[in-house]
Every structure is written in structure tokens, then in C-alpha cells.
């Protein structure tokens, strides 16, 4: 079982008299910065020239610097830019400004685990990853609560990297809910697997396969959309709040019987595929593919996204969502 830590297990003293630079001011960066500051920690922001977030960060009372200036001024540098941006940003702006005993921090382990960022031996390296979007991390903090999180230490130069990581997690509110200790390897590989096999790739593939099956059998696209996509939220919300067994308690006996008998067939079909997907992640095959795709300016990726955007489920959904006033007409 996992080791889980709470407020009493962590001390903010390890960040006392230190400056934390948050590189990036998006969803997570915004939440981390505000929560850390409200926890009494000195925070500065590092943003590239021309960033749309500069004025927002300044309006919220932060000193804003270029990433290299922020890294130079900070003791702890948390990099919260997209994974694909981090390696070049690190090489140009952060690495040249790292001092002995600094701490380099991440919210996802991809670039460290797959060797896209190789930190010098004279710094601490840790990870703190709240298991929720930035707005929730901030909202829960303001309510005196927190969002559970993960933390890991990759490199402990000072002998205090673990304590500093836990202090950071406490500063953003994670220890109020529960902080789970992990490794960069575990966080990275499980995060990628969840995205590919279940949360994004798996869910969207099931939706499209179900939708297409009904259409090909002669059913109306609108009805297929409701049954295979729209109602998914109802079930996921129940699972999210009550777990799988709790969800089953809330559905009809007919639905429950179909779940436990027919769902097993899907399980048996996808389990071997899941093992293959995980193997590709563990062996670095996916990381290599994604890195090379970005080097080539994403031709395959862009083509696949465009193709999926033209899927009939998108056209049908766009029209049906106009019938749902509770969505407020919001689009992307």
C-alpha cells in the first residue's frame, strides 16, 4: 500500500527564507503560485516575453521576470510549462542559472524519466503533482481543504529534497487531503497509461466504436449519440463520487446485469491491448515516437486529430448540444 502523508507530516519551515519561481502561469501555475504565497512563501513568476499571462500575474500581485531571471533569483524552480516546451526552455533559461543546492521541480515526470532533461548533480530534483485541475486546487485551498497529490524525489543533493518537496506540497494544500509518495517512473508511466488506455484514448475509442456500431445497424445518429456519448457523463459522475459498486447501486437491474455480463467481454478483449500499450510506455517506445513527432512538426499527429474532428459523432454532437440550455451555449 502507498505511504500517505498529511499536514502534520510536513513542515513549511523547509521553504522559509527561500524564493520559489513558478515558470508558467497557466491552470496549475496560477494555483500553485497563489496557494504558496497564501501559505507564507515568497513566490515569483517566470514568463516568456509576450506571454498573455504576464498582465494577469502582475495584476494578482506577483513580480514577473523572464524565465532565466526568475531561475537566477530563485532557490526552488517549479517548471509548469507544457512537456514539449520544457527541454528547450530548461537548456536556454534554467540550467545556466542553477546554483548549487537549488531545487528543480516538476508536476509531471516525463522529461526527467525519459532523459529529455538531465539535471546537474548539484541540485535537488522533485515532483509534486496535484490530482486535480488548477482551478480545483485553488478553490479547495481557499475553502481550507485540499486536492490529493503525488510527490517524488529523483535527486537529493542537499539531503533535504524530500522535506522540501513535502513542504511545497503542503504549501499548495495537498497534505490537507493526502499526499502519496511515488517515483518519477511510476508517476510518468501510470499517467501516460491512464491517458492512452482509459481516460482519453480508451474512452474516445469506446464512444466512437459504440456510435458507429449503432449507425451501421440502421439506428438514428442522434439516438446513438445520446446512448454512447451524452449519457456517459451520468455514469462517470456516479463512479467518480461513489466508485463502481456505488454506480451500480444507482442504475437499473437491467443495466447492472448487462454491465456485469457483457462488460466482461469488453474487458477480455482490451486487457491484452492494455498490456501492450503499457509495455510501449515502459520501454520508452511511446516517448521516442512522441519526441520525434514533435521534431518533425507533428505531421502524423495533426492528420489524426483532423480526421477525428471530421467524425460523424462530432457533427451530430454539435447540433444536439444546441438543445441543451444547461451547457450555456459554450463551445471551444
UniProtKB/Swiss-Prot annotation:
What protein name is recorded for this chain?
Ketol-acid reductoisomerase (NADP(+))
* UniProt key word NADP: yes
The protein's organism comes out as: Sulfurihydrogenibium sp. (strain YO3AOP1)
What is the reaction catalyzed?
A: (2R)-2,3-dihydroxy-3-methylbutanoate + NADP(+) = (2S)-2-acetolactate + NADPH + H(+); (2R,3R)-2,3-dihydroxy-3-methylpentanoate + NADP(+) = (S)-2-ethyl-2-hydroxy-3-oxobutanoate + NADPH + H(+)
Give an example GO biological process: L-valine biosynthetic process
Q: Provide the residue positions that the database annotates as binding Mg(2+) 2.
A: 191, 227, 231
UniProt KW Transmembrane helix keyword: no
The encoding gene is ilvC
| Assigned EC number | 1.1.1.86
Physiological role: Involved in the biosynthesis of branched-chain amino acids (BCAA). Catalyzes an alkyl-migration followed by a ketol-acid reduction of (S)-2-acetolactate (S2AL) to yield (R)-2,3-dihydroxy-isovalerate. In the isomerase reaction, S2AL is rearranged via a Mg-dependent methyl migration to produce 3-hydroxy-3-methyl-2-ketobutyrate (HMKB). In the reductase reaction, this 2-ketoacid undergoes a metal-dependent reduction by NADPH to yield (R)-2,3-dihydroxy-isovalerate.
Cellular-component GO terms for this entry: cytosol
Cofactors, names only: Mg(2+)
* Pathway annotation: Amino-acid biosynthesis; L-isoleucine biosynthesis; L-isoleucine from 2-oxobutanoate: step 2/4; Amino-acid biosynthesis; L-valine biosynthesis; L-valine from pyruvate: step 2/4
Could you say which protein family the record assigns here? Belongs to the ketol-acid reductoisomerase family.
